[in-house]
Amino acid sequence: MAYDWLKGVADEYDVIVIGSGLGGLTAANVLAKAGHRVLVLEHHYQFGGLATWFTRRGGHIFDISLHGFPSGMIKSCRKYWTREISDAIVPLKDVRFVNPQMDVRTTFTRDDYTRVLVEQFGVERTKVEAFYDHLRAMNFYDNNPETTGEMFERFFPGRDDVKRLLMEPIAYANGSSLADPAITFGIVFSNFMGAGVYTYRGGSDDLVEKMAAELRRNGVELRKKVLVERILVEERNGRKVAAGIVAKGGRVVRAKAVLSNANLKNTILRLAGEESFPADYVTAAKAVRINTSSCQVYLGIRKGESIPYIGDLVFTSANPRFSSTELTDLNTTSRTFSVYYPDTRPGGDRYTVVVSLNARYEDWARLSDEEYEREKQRLIDESIAALERYIPGVGAKIDWREAATPRTVERYTTHFGGTSFGTKFEGLKVSMDLPEKLPGLYHAGSVGIIMSGWLGTINYGVIVANKVDKALHAEKRPAPAPTPA
């Protein structure tokens, strides 16, 4: 008889969180500290969403997410998690860009990026400062239709090399392209330009384990290996409302509010179902474009071997010019090396390299099993060959090679289209409007590009948790007494 992963779970909670990505976990923590009874359900065998890890024979630990985020993570983790977590967030010292148009090393701070643009690229300092000021002034509510590509051309006409330096790291960070609204670049880039790129010392395993411990201290019930099949929808006073979840196997757990940390389209079209929403909202949800996916190659260096320091994040490409299309092509030459040195996990002596490539789900979904295995092997071989340029002879030091594709992302996250970056910009409004269309249901996943990445999803989790808290308190307030005639 299969083990019951819901054994001991109560029949009702104040809030059920579906999914345990950073947005879901943070929302759960905020709500628990506000005094609500919270249940988190995760279908995977460990928590963290895409901020996760896996182990392999030979003592290897591989982190999944590209390990770089803005300094704002320090403040957010201190405020919504613990000082112990925030104190482990440290700067990455060396970000590199190597392609036919440039060979740049930078700390990725505003001052250093300005130095690179002025000294290496010959851009006038006044133009650089004007560009930064424009980005800082951007507002979500301005509804500016300008695209990122159009904005670049306005500030740096004809300078494809400058556009590449600006766009490439953000494309890896959140899947955005030159055709996306300029605000999707501006907000994220400005966040990075504050104080550079940071990472979590200790690895994703240490981070998520500390988060899980904090959640339990605050009374959150955490359960993994539980697949939510659908959101329980009932009719009350002539209107449909979210009333809980139905897990695989049929177990019903009720709740005053359900917060989905799943993909937005999964939440609306699969979990709640089209029939639960007004027709115009379903049309808007279907029109939301899914963002791109990713491939990764995991390279483990044999115990006892070492590799030289080549930088923390190395953005590389053999493509002559920057192209959002080439960046996601099945045969792209554009890849990022995330290099994990022993100080990533203090006390250890191991080196690993995670190679990240942006990708399109449809390119991988159509492959036969034989073609799929062949393409994965090509990814591995080409990634090692590219790494040899920076570390000659590294292939002989590697004793674990493995590749993941958009199909892997889909398998472990159930995301629509295997997306690793949520939705395009229009998804943010659909996500924010969810509780108006189906009371009791909220969404705090990766949406709109600006709510992507570790910092974006944590902050969105806080925003949505505060909405849930406000709604729950409003429910508890007694109805006002009728006014005497």
Give, region by region, the residue ranges found by the protein language model.
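A glycine-rich dinucleotide-binding beta-alpha-beta segment and adjacent secondary-structure elements
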Residues: R164-A173, R389-M451
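Helical element adjacent to the flavin cofactor pocket in flavoenzyme catalytic cores
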Residues: F189-A242, V246
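Rossmann-like flavin
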Residues: P100-A182
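Mid-domain catalytic core of redox enzymes
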Residues: E229-G348
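A conserved FAD-binding loop/helix module that cradles the flavin
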Residues: S446-V468
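C-terminal segments that line or cap access tunnels to active or ligand-binding sites in enzymes
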Residues: R302-A404
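Active-site-proximal substrate-binding core of FAD-dependent oxidoreductases
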Residues: V233, D469-A485
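N-terminal glycine-rich phosphate/pyrophosphate-binding loop and immediately adjacent elements
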Residues: A2-V123
